[in-house]
C-alpha cells in the first residue's frame, strides 16, 4: 500500500511562522503523530507532500523511509496528491492522510483499507451533530455514496446532511491517477478537490465503501491555536483514561500531561499537575508527587518522588526518595535507597546505595559510594572555567555541612570532612580532614557604638 500524507497547508489561522504540521501535540509535531500511525500500517511507499515551510518539515522528519513531494501553490487537496503520483506504485492501493489530523487510530484505518480491498474506493466518514464546514456525503436511494459536496458548494438539502467527509480515503492507484487528471477547479474555492474522485468513481460504477471511526476525535483536524488546544485536552484525557484502565491511580485525571511515552508498573500513584516528557518508565509502587516534571527517565520500584521535582535523563533506584524541590539532571544514576532532598541538584553523577544528600547541595560530575552522607551546603566544584573534573567519594564517607570539594579530588573510604572544609587535596580514608580558619575568641572586645552627631 502507498500512503500519501498532505502537509503543505499554509495554516494562516495559526498566526505563526511555524508550519502548521510542526506545531506540537502532546510534545511532538502533528505530522509526527500521523507518520507514526502510517508506519504502523507497513506501507511500501510513504510520501509526504510539503509546501509552506517545506525545508523545516523535511528536517523534522529526517527519515529514510519517507520521501517528499512539493506543492508550490496551494491549489487544493486533489492538486496536492497529484504532486506525489510519480512516486506511487500502481499495483497497490493508495491511502491519503492529512498532516493536521493527528489522532486517527491505526485500527480505524485498517478497517477502511480492509473494506475497500484492492479494487474499491473507500471513504472514512463520520456523523456530526454540527457538520458546519465539512463536505457532505451524498448517497442515493440505495445508500450508495455518489459524491461529496463541499460546504461552500452545497445546496440547502445537502447542507442538512450530517454525515461528513473526513478527507481520508483509499483507492486503486491506477484509477486515482486517471481521475486526478480529469479534475476541474470550477467551484467556489477555485481549487482541485480530491473529493471529486468520488463522483468519478460512482460514474464508472466502481463500488464505494465507507468506514467510520469509533470516536469523533479521531477525525478532528487543526486549523487554529484554539483547535490545537482543544485537541490537546482531548488527547490528554484519552491518555489518562488508558492509564486508569491499566491500574494507575491518578489523583485528578484532568491534571496530567503526557508528552511522550509513559510506561507504568503496578500500583503507581501520580498526583496532580505532573508532566511526563519523552520516554518515562515508572516501576511498581512508584509514587509521584504533585507538580513533578520528568523527562526521559526511569524511576524504579518503590521510589517516591516528592512534589516539585525536576528529573531529566536520569535513573532513580528502587526505594529511593527524591525531593521535594530536587533536580536530577542528565547523566544522574542513583542506586537503591538513595535520598536526595530539598534544593539538591545532581548532574552527571553516580550515587551508590543508601547514600544521602538531604539539603541544599550540588553534586556534579561525581562518583559517590555507598552509605555516604553529604551535608547541607556541600558543593562539588567541578568546573575551572574551561574544563570539568570529577570528584570521587568512596564508601562510608561523611561530608560535613558547607564543604567545597575542588575537583579533581578523592575522599577515601570512611573519611570525614569537617564542616566548612574546602578540600583541594585528596582526603585519606578513615581520617578526619578539616580545612578552615582556626576559631579565635577576643577577650574584652566590644561592638562599636554609633557616634552621636553634634546638634
Swiss-Prot record:
Region (Pyrophosphorylase): 1-225
Subcellular location, principal: cytoplasm
GO CC annotation: cytoplasm; membrane
A Pfam family annotated for this UniProt entry: NTP_transf_3
Gene Ontology molecular function: any one: UDP-N-acetylglucosamine diphosphorylase activity
SUPFAM superfamilies: Nucleotide-diphospho-sugar transferases (SSF53448), Trimeric LpxA-like enzymes (SSF51161)
NCBIfam families in UniProt: glmU
Similarity field: In the N-terminal section; belongs to the N-acetylglucosamine-1-phosphate uridyltransferase family. In the C-terminal section; belongs to the transferase hexapeptide repeat family.
Protein's name according to its UniProt entry: Bifunctional protein GlmU
Organism annotation: Ralstonia nicotianae (strain ATCC BAA-1114 / GMI1000) (Ralstonia solanacearum)
Gene: glmU
Amino acid at each position: 500500500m502507498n500512503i500519501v500524507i498532505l502537509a503543505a497547508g499554509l495554516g494562516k489561522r495559526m498566526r505563526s511562522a511555524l508550519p502548521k504540521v510542526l506545531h506540537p501535540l502532546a510534545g511532538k509535531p502533528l505530522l509526527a503523530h500521523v507518520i507514526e500511525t502510517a508506519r504502523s500500517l507497513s506501507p511500501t511507499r510513504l510520501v509526504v507532500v510539503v509546501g509552506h515551510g517545506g525545508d523545516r518539515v523535511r528536517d523534522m522528519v529526517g527519515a529514510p523511509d519517507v520521501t517528499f513531494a512539493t506543492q508550490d501553490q496551494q491549489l487544493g487537496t486533489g492538486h496536492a496528491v497529484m504532486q506525489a503520483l510519480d512516486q506511487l506504485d500502481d499495483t497497490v492501493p493508495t491511502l491519503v492522510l492529512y498532516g493536521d489530523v493527528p489522532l486517527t487510530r491505526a485500527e480505524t484505518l485498517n478497517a477502511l483499507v480492509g473494506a475497500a480491498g484492492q479494487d474499491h474506493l473507500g471513504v472514512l466518514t463520520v456523523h456530526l451533530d454540527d457538520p458546519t464546514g465539512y463536505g457532505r456525503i451524498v448517497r442515493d436511494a440505495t445508500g450508495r455514496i455518489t459524491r461529496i459536496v463541499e460546504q461552500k458548494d452545497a445546496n440547502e438539502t445537502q447542507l442538512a446532511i450530517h454525515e461528513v467527509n473526513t478527507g481520508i480515503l483509499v483507492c486503486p492507484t491506477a484509477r486515482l491517477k486517471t481521475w486526478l487528471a480529469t479534475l476541474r477547479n470550477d467551484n467556489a474555492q477555485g481549487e482541485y478537490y480530491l473529493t471529486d474522485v468520488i463522483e468519478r468513481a460512482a460514474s464508472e460504477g466502481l463500488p464505494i465503501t465507507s468506514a467510520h471511526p469509533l470516536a469523533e476525535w479521531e477525525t478532528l483536524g487543526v486549523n487554529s491555536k484554539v483547535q490545537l488546544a482543544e485537541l490537546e485536552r482531548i488527547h490528554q484525557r484519552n491518555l489518562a483514561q488508558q492509564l486508569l484502565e491499566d491500574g494507575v491511580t491518578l489523583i485528578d485525571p484532568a491534571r496530567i500531561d503526557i508528552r511522550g511515552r509513559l510506561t507504568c508498573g503496578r500500583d503507581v500513584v501520580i498526583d496532580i499537575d505532573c508532566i511526563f516528557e519523552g520516554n518515562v518508565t515508572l516501576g511498581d509502587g512508584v509514587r509521584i508527587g504533585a507538580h513533578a516534571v520528568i523527562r526521559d527517565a526511569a524511576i524504579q520500584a518503590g521510589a517516591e518522588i516528592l512534589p516539585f521535582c525536576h528529573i531529566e535523563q536520569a535513573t532513580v533506584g528502587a526505594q529511593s526518595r527524591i525531593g521535594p524541590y530536587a533536580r536530577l539532571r542528565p547523566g544522574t544514576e542513583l542506586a537503591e535507597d538513595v535520598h536526595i532532598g530539598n534544593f539538591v541538584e545532581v548532574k552527571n553523577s553516580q550515587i551508590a546505595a543508601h547514600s544521602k544528600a538531604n539539603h541544599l547541595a550540588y553534586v556534579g560530575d561525581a562518583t559517590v559510594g555507598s552509605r555516604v552522607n553529604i551535608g547541607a551546603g556541600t558543593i562539588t566544584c567541578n568546573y575551572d572555567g574551561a574544563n570539568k573534573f570529577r570528584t570521587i567519594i568512596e564508601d562510608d564517607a561523611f561530608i560535613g555541612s558547607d564543604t567545597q570539594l575542588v575537583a579533581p579530588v578523592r575522599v577515601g573510604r570512611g573519611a570525614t570532612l569537617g564542616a566548612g572544609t574546602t578540600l583541594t587535596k585528596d582526603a585519606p580514608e578513615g581520617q578526619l580532614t578539616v580545612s578552615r580558619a582556626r576559631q579565635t575568641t577576643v577577650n574584652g572586645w566590644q561592638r562599636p557604638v554609633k557616634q552621636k552627631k553634634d546638634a
